[in-house]
């Protein structure tokens, strides 16, 4: 998939910034993604495709990563707008996280349906919001990432835990129950989500500490 190749090229450029072939491929793939967004978007639909599908937040995350490497502020703005639109689609009226349900797949330009909800969506959302928070420091990204992680712990439509007591993760949330299977994808999604939210919390705590640190009147340096 181009989305995977985008991320690979970003890694290559991050280690060898002068790698011209990698940069050219990144420009091409990211440009295609941006063109899709600008072609498909319409009133009340700020997305790359006519449908919401699987692992949705990876699309704006990839575009946001590419914008950082390429120094494209226009690309960055479009990526943040798409992620913000997805954030609103994934927020229930009661305020908790509600990932795009699998019943939504194939429904063009329609609001997402609530079920079935899958662990992969919460992980992808946390990763994308963590990157967005690093980009602009907007508290909404931090809050939405926390809401997505809380989904695993019971802050969801049924009020039940998706994460199992032994550190595993069930396969999803159906309209009337939890799918008690524990596939590798679901377990890994929860484990990676836990790592991602820990990193986000550490970064946010460091920023909060810096903001609260008093500044000396002379010289403008932080007091110690």
Predicted regions and their residues:
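Glycan-recognition and catalytic cores of secretory/periplasmic carbohydrate-active enzymes
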Residues: 1-224
């Amino acid at each position: 998939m181009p989305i995977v190749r985008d991320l690979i090229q970003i890694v290559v450029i991050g280690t060898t910034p002068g790698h011209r072939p990698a940069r050219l491929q990144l420009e091409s793939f990211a440009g295609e993604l941006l063109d899709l967004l600008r072609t498909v978007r319409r009133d009340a639909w700020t997305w790359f495709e006519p449908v919401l599908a699987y692992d949705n937040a990876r699309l704006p995350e990839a575009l946001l990563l590419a914008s950082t490497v390429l120094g494209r502020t226009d690309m960055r703005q479009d990526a943040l707008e798409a992620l913000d639109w997805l954030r609103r689609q994934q927020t229930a009226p009661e305020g908790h996280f509600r990932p795009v349900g699998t019943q939504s797949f194939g429904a063009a330009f329609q609001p997402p349906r609530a079920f079935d909800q899958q662990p992969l969506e919460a992980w992808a959302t946390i990763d994308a919001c963590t990157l967005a928070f690093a980009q602009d420091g907007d508290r909404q990204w931090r809050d939405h990432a926390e809401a997505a992680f809380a989904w695993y712990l019971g802050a969801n439509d049924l009020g039940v835990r998706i994460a199992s007591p032994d550190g595993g993760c069930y396969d999803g949330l159906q309209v009337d129950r939890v799918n008690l299977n524990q596939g590798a994808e679901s377990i890994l999604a929860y484990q990676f989500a836990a790592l991602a939210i820990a990193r986000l919390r550490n970064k946010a705590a460091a920023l909060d500490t810096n903001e609260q640190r008093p500044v000396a009147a002379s010289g403008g340096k932080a007091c110690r």
